[in-house]
A protein has these predicted regions:
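Boundary-proximal intrinsically disordered activation/regulatory segments immediately upstream
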Residues: 1-64
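Phosphate- and divalent-cation-binding pockets in alpha/beta enzyme and binding domains
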Residues: 45-46, 69-70, 94
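Short, aromatic/basic amphipathic alpha-helical patches
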Residues: 69-81
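A glycine-rich helix N-cap at a beta->alpha junction
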Residues: 80-96
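Glycine/small-residue-rich phosphate/adenosyl-binding loop
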Residues: 99
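Glycine-rich phosphate-binding loops that contact phosphosugars or nucleotide phosphates
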Residues: 106
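Conserved small/polar residues in nucleotide/adenosyl-binding loops
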Residues: 114-116
């Protein structure tokens, strides 16, 4: 688990998340085989795969409140291989696709059958 802090609205991380969620997001998600899980329930489900070809969580974007919510409900060992970026509320508001973000986003990648 590697931690970083993002406070700039012009960060490449912000731009990537916005691109995946934006109007051209469907095409970008298909090409990159990536998507954004938004909110506590979606992120928990991504971290607890129930199927063999479940998506892999590459990076978590968390506010302080989002971090507390997530850690309260999961086994911390699930985060060992995940990059974690702490973000300000302003950055989360810019990245999230909802009016009232929960402070938790995950960048996920679909596994390909070719790699198995």
């Amino acid at each position: 688990m590697t931690n970083s802090h993002i406070s700039s609205l012009h960060s490449p991380h912000v731009e990537r998340v916005k691109a995946l969620l934006g109007p051209r997001g469907k095409k970008i998600r298909a090409v990159e085989k990536s998507f954004i899980a938004d909110g506590i329930q979606s992120v928990r489900e991504a971290l607890h795969p129930r199927i063999e070809l479940a998506p892999v969580v590459e990076r978590l974007y968390l506010t302080d409140v989002g971090r507390e919510r997530l850690i309260a409900g999961i086994d911390a060992r699930l985060l060992d291989s995940v990059e974690i970026s702490m973000v300000t509320d302003d950055v989360m508001n810019a990245m999230a696709d909802t009016e009232s973000p929960q402070g938790i986003l995950a960048l996920c990648t679909h596994l390909s059958l070719i790699h198995i």
